[in-house]
């Protein structure tokens, strides 16, 4: 039998928290990129993107960048950066948005996007994903 589980390992929790915080920083940088490509103030950009998630921010940046940068080297470089952000977010989401569960008197698992159970990542594995996000 497998049941929902809240991890208690301090190293896992540290790594999980840092990954979550690093991703919040990434989203903030995407908001600041909206500011730059839209040529608006910080406050205006923050207000305009307040409830936008990572995907919506990347899509908004792509649209604004095509308009403001045209077919340029800068646009291609920005598009490549946005693709790396998308991959980093997907890796982070594997851990943050999935269920953690434990077998009775057994191992701890995380459910994958394809509804399979895999071992809970270690703190060093989470640190590696955090480094991708940063």
Give the residues covered by each predicted segment.
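Juxtamembrane loop-transmembrane helix junctions in multi-pass integral membrane proteins
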Residues: 8, 70, 74-77
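Amphipathic, Lys/Arg-enriched alpha-helical patches that create a basic surface
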Residues: 109-134
């Amino acid at each position: 039998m497998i049941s929902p589980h809240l991890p208690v390992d301090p190293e896992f929790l540290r790594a999980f928290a840092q990954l979550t915080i690093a991703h919040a920083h990434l989203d903030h940088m995407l908001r600041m990129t909206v500011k730059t490509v839209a040529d608006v103030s910080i406050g205006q950009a923050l207000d305009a993107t307040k409830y936008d998630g990572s995907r919506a921010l990347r899509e908004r940046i792509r649209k604004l960048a095509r308009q403001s940068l045209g077919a340029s080297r800068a646009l291609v470089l920005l598009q490549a950066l946005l693709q790396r952000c998308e991959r980093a977010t997907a890796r982070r989401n594997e851990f943050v948005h999935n269920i953690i569960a434990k077998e009775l008197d057994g191992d701890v698992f995380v459910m994958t996007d394809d509804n399979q159970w895999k071992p809970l990542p270690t703190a060093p594995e989470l640190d590696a994903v955090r480094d991708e996000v940063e």
